[in-house]
């Protein structure tokens, strides 16, 4: 929910609600001018999304009514993944920031010609006719997920809202896909719902999808793209790091994915 006012006015209600609903974690997004208020109420800053509020940073604070939820069980592994990402050459991402990318729209035939995908692969925006196959792929890829991507109707509904879906096909069969949840008011977009089938991983599909989403977002005058990705998954973290995204924090036990709650890394990039 959105709240305008002093955080202390709502902190008690949030704590009571968490107790009633047996919530293990309370998450608060706040602009820079309000960032000290959650701290005075016992909240801890876990990360930042750069330029989230139409150019202003967003500070993410958390409180853990359930103390066990605060424990990161794979911290050492996740720290190693980030260390490896930051150690690798990020020159490509830096160069991309310096370049003035044309905002002119081109057709998808031209984009296909410039694609780095191997022969037989096609990258394109998803359409309504893809929803059934997309839902099936998501249901196979995630045992648990924060949103019902396994439902065709849900995907169709989000297609009509502020969600862009892009996919990679191999001879007409979807092998990789991702989306961008757009916030037009604040001109930010979250790149999410990233999935590649096991036999196609490591071939660079996700990087191409991210690039395509970024291009579309830039053409729509969005300021920033960011992601909250699984902290224990090396591939997806490496993909965002190699594209010039900055690591800006980790949200502990934040999302139900796979077998339970997982830590999520924050990566941000100006468009």
From Swiss-Prot:
Induction: Transcription is induced at high salt concentrations. Forms part of an operon with ablA. Pfam families: Acetyltransf_1. It comes from the Archaea. Residues 86-122 are annotated as: Disordered. Keywords: Acyltransferase, Transferase. Residues 121-269 form the N-acetyltransferase domain. GO terms for molecular function: N-acetyltransferase activity. It catalyses: (3S)-3,6-diaminohexanoate + acetyl-CoA = (3S)-6-acetamido-3-aminohexanoate + CoA + H(+). It is an enzyme of class 2 (transferase). Its EC number is 2.3.1.264. Residues 95-114 have a biased composition (Basic residues). InterPro entries: Acyl_CoA_acyltransferase, GNAT_AblB, GNAT_dom. Disulfide bonds: none annotated. Belongs to the acetyltransferase family. Catalyzes the acetylation of beta-lysine to N6-acetyl-beta-lysine, a compatible solute produced by methanogenic archaea that helps cells to cope with salt stress. This is Beta-lysine N(6)-acetyltransferase. It comes from Methanosarcina mazei (strain ATCC BAA-159 / DSM 3647 / Goe1 / Go1 / JCM 11833 / OCM 88). The lineage of its organism: Archaea, Methanobacteriati, Methanobacteriota, Stenosarchaea group, Methanomicrobia.
């Amino acid at each position: 929910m959105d709240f305008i006012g002093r955080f202390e006015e709502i902190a008690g209600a949030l704590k009571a609600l968490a107790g009633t609903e047996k919530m293990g974690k309370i998450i608060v997004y706040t602009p820079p001018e309000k960032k000290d208020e959650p701290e005075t109420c016992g909240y801890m800053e876990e990360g930042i999304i750069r330029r989230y509020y139409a150019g202003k940073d967003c500070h993410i604070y958390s409180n853990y009514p359930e103390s066990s939820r605060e424990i990161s069980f794979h911290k050492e592994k996740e720290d190693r993944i980030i260390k490896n990402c930051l150690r690798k050459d990020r020159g490509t991402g830096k160069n991309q920031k310096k370049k003035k990318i044309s905002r002119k729209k081109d057709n998808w035939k031209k984009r296909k010609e410039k694609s780095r995908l191997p022969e037989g692969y096609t990258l394109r925006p998803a359409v309504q006719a893809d929803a059934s196959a997309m839902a099936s792929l998501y249901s196979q890829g995630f045992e648990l997920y924060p949103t019902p991507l396994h439902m065709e109707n849900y995907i169709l509904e989000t297609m009509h809202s502020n969600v862009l879906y892009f996919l990679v096909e191999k001879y007409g069969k979807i092998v990789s896909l991702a989306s961008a949840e757009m916030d037009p008011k604040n001109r930010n977009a979250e790149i999410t719902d990233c999935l590649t089938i096991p036999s196609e991983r490591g071939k660079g599909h996700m990087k191409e999808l991210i690039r395509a989403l970024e291009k579309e977002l830039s053409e729509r005058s969005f300021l920033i793209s960011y992601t909250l990705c699984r902290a224990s998954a090396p591939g997806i973290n490496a993909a965002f790091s190699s594209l010039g995204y900055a690591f800006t924090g980790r949200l502990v036990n934040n999302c139900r994915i796979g077998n339970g709650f997982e830590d999520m890394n924050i990566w941000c990039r100006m468009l």
